[in-house]
Swiss-Prot record:
Belongs to the PIGV family. GO terms for cellular component: endoplasmic reticulum membrane; mannosyltransferase complex. It is an enzyme of class 2 (transferase). This is GPI mannosyltransferase 2. Mannosyltransferase involved in glycosylphosphatidylinositol-anchor biosynthesis. Transfers the second mannose to the glycosylphosphatidylinositol during GPI precursor assembly. Disulfide bonds: none annotated. It is a multi-pass membrane protein. One of its GO terms (molecular function) is alpha-1,6-mannosyltransferase activity. GO terms for biological process: GPI anchor biosynthetic process. Pfam families: Mannosyl_trans2. InterPro entries: PIG-V/Gpi18. The lineage of its organism: Eukaryota, Fungi, Dikarya, Ascomycota, Pezizomycotina.
Length: 434
């Protein structure tokens, strides 16, 4: 496998020195994307970014005209689309109801860290976390496992999320939290197999904490709770087949606590919003009187038209076409994970579990989201990276397998790079899609 992959990778990437190579590739890629964005000639059709530095003094027509023609500073080139809301929330807190559609956890963290720096740092560490997660699953004692780990981390650098992983968006932080959560979860399974029960339980709870924070950053983080639901069902099955034991009950208790911790990432921001809007002297908003008073669900439907089949219009067909390759990869990789037999028990266990959040995200994006966002929110789900890499060989689980279809792999990489370049140009010019 090593000989075949050597033909497909540039000299810059050396699997024998993975951290150095990944770090160098990461910062070169980030510099390249940044230069593209700041080199874009104009603000595009929307000048909302220009209002941010002058908002308090922009009452007069002369000021507004000055804003319209003012050159944007380099940092503001990265403030596009949703990031305008993030920057406003950090500066003025949650002022408008519709702003609660944007991750509460992410805006709180932005209050302490520079947004662009946070995005770059989080993306960098998510690359390293993906490498370590892949090592846990595929092993590092064989050439095949080491290369899968290295190349999947490389794909994460140039993934279709592109400029959104550099801008003040929640995707990079979510990616870091979710992938690191998967790493701790897989480490928990490894410790459980080795008989290290205390360590396994501790890592499982730490993984739940990261999934909870990820859910506060992006609500789709709640899908990682499917891992805990799966584990709970396994423990219940053991009770029915093996009888009740202290070890099984303890593990089940840890799993249930972990699931509750993840749910807090969704519940706590909703409770804060409820106390703000529904427990004041002001007239109640409509969502306050719903059976489940969720501001997030309300603003998504009311302001952003997000809901089941709401995006299924003829005018949005180009966006479905744009999202199709990633939707296909997400669905196909979930099926692949369920059907592929691996020699390592940990690989089979983790991949089977990851198929659930991966596939659910694709289905929800297709039926209920603004479908094009799948190209950026998929960055925090590692299954499709592994699927692409493993298609290079006909028997990926065999360390002596020979690489095939390397040309297809090269075309896929070239397509991702071209997409990222075009997307960076459109993003820098404030042009859709977002």
């Amino acid at each position: 496998m090593a000989a075949g992959l050597a033909l497909a990778r540039p000299n810059l990437l050396n699997p024998n020195n993975p951290i150095r190579s990944l770090s160098l590739a990461f910062w070169l890629w980030k510099a390249f994307v940044f230069l593209i964005i700041i080199g874009c000639p104009g603000p595009g059709y929307d000048t909302s970014t220009g209002l941010l530095p002058y908002q308090e003094s922009a009452a007069s027509g002369a000021k507004l005209e000055a804003i319209r023609h003012a050159p944007f500073s380099f940092p503001l080139k990265l403030v596009r689309w949703d990031s305008i809301y993030f920057v406003h929330i950090v500066r003025d807190d949650y002022v408008f109801e519709q702003e609660w559609a944007f991750g509460y956890g992410y805006t709180r963290i932005l209050s302490f860290l520079t947004s662009v720096a946070l995005s770059h740092i989080a993306h960098y560490f998510s690359v390293l976390a993906l490498y370590r997660l892949s090592i846990n699953i595929f092993g590092h004692d064989n050439t095949s496992g080491a290369l899968i780990s290295f190349l999947s981390a490389t794909l994460h650098i140039i993934c279709p999320a592109g400029a959104f992983l550099s801008a003040p968006y929640g995707e990079s932080l979510f990616s870091f939290l979710n992938i690191t959560g998967y790493f701790l979860y897989s480490s928990s399974l490894l410790d459980a197999n080795a008989g290290k029960r205390a360590s396994s339980d501790a890592k499982l709870l730490l993984a739940a904490a990261l999934f909870s924070i990820a859910t506060a950053v992006r609500s789709n983080g709640i899908l990682s709770g499917a891992l805990f639901a799966f584990d709970a069902l396994l423990q219940l099955r053991k009770i029915f087949t093996q009888g009740i034991s202290g070890d099984i009950l303890l593990r089940l208790g840890v799993i249930v606590v972990g699931g509750c911790v993840i749910a807090l990432g969704l519940i706590v921001p909703q409770w804060i919003a409820y106390t703000t809007f529904c427990m004041s002297d002001e007239p109640l908003r409509p969502w306050c009187e719903q059976l489940i008073p969720s501001i997030y669900g309300w603003v998504q439907v009311h302001y952003w038209n997000v809901g089941f089949l709401r995006y299924w219009t003829l005018s949005n067909l180009p966006l479905f076409i744009l999202a199709f390759p990633m939707l296909f990869l997400m669905c196909r990789s979930s099926i692949w994970a369920l059907n592929t037999a691996w020699p390592l028990d940990t690989a089979t266990a983790v991949l089977t579990r990851l198929a659930a959040p991966n596939g659910l995200l694709a289905v929800m994006a297709f039926t209920s989201y603004h479908v094009q966002i799948i190209n950026r929110i998929s960055s925090g789900y590692p299954l499709w990276y592994w699927y692409i890499i493993c298609q290079l060989s006909s028997h990926v689980a065999d360390s002596s397998s020979v690489v095939k279809r390397s040309q297809t792999f090269s075309i896929a990489i070239q397509g991702m790079v071209i997409y990222a370049i075009v997307q960076a140009v459109l993003f820098g010019s404030f042009l859709p899609p977002a």
